[in-house]
């Protein structure tokens, strides 16, 4: 990935990609790691054929003015409400625009719109796979550092024909004697699914009111230099 050109507005480009080779026959392909020919449909003999080798990737263009950056293209996301699955051999990709701003001291603001995603076992983007997958996802959020011991954040997601999700987090570090401290972290998610969404994460069978709430609280004790 390049840096930025000089000037009031700086421009840059970047590329991202991966290549894979399958060792052996692996007749049990279909585990969301190895892509399948014909989108996983069986052939005339009832077999599903996996790729022997494959590559994926894309590019980005980016611009920066002052302390604000805008990126468009293929990206690996790590937002609380929209994150790429990196637990497979290769990561999930999203295609779209992401703005990140640090114009105000100690405040980070993000906003973005994504129109395609590519799972780890997909050769083509979801727009080409039977019309299923991501239609349009809009994300927004902010994180503010009040001081060295306290920060808070909020992020939101509106994924068309899928779900709305909201996330809040508060993190506080309590200094103690002898270079030790206690850190408290509180997180919460609220998700509401559209009637047509495919999900098992629901607390009711009422399709017009499918939602869930998740809360998490953790405490960590730290001592010594860290």
Predicted regions and their residues:
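Feature captures outer-membrane beta-barrel proteins of Gram-negative bacteria and organelles
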Residues: 2-3, 59-66, 94-104, 129-148, ...
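A cross-family glycoside hydrolase active-site/sugar-binding cleft signature
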Residues: 14-16, 155, 187
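Outer membrane beta-barrel
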Residues: 2-126, 142-151
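Outer-membrane beta-barrel translocator/channel fold
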Residues: 20-23, 107-130, 179-226
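Generic structural motif
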Residues: 3-5, 18-20, 159, 173-175, ...
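A conserved mid-domain beta-alpha-beta active-site/ligand-binding segment of alpha/beta enzyme cores
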Residues: 138-142, 154-159
């Amino acid at each position: 990935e390049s840096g930025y050109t000089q000037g009031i507005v700086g421009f840059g480009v970047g590329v991202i990609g991966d290549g894979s080779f399958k060792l052996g026959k692996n007749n049990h392909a279909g585990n969301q790691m190895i892509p399948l020919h014909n989108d996983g449909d069986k052939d005339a003999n009832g077999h599903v054929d996996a790729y022997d080798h494959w590559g994926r990737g894309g590019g980005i263009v980016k611009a920066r003015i002052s302390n604000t950056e805008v990126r468009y293209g293929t990206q690996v996301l790590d937002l609380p409400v929209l994150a790429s699955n990196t637990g497979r051999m290769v990561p999930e990709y999203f295609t779209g625009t992401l703005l990140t701003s640090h114009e105000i001291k100690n405040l980070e603001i993000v906003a973005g719109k994504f129109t395609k995603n590519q799972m780890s076992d997909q050769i083509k983007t979801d727009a080409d796979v039977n019309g299923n997958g991501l239609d349009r996802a809009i994300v927004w959020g902010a994180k503010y550092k009040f001081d060295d011991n306290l920060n808070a954040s909020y992020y939101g997601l509106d994924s068309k024909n899928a779900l709305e999700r909201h996330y809040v987090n508060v993190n506080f570090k309590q200094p103690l004697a002898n270079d030790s401290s206690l850190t408290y972290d509180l997180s919460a998610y609220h998700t509401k699914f559209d009637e047509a969404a495919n999900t098992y994460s629901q607390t009711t069978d009422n399709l017009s009111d499918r939602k869930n709430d998740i809360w998490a609280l953790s405490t960590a004790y730290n001592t010594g230099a860290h």
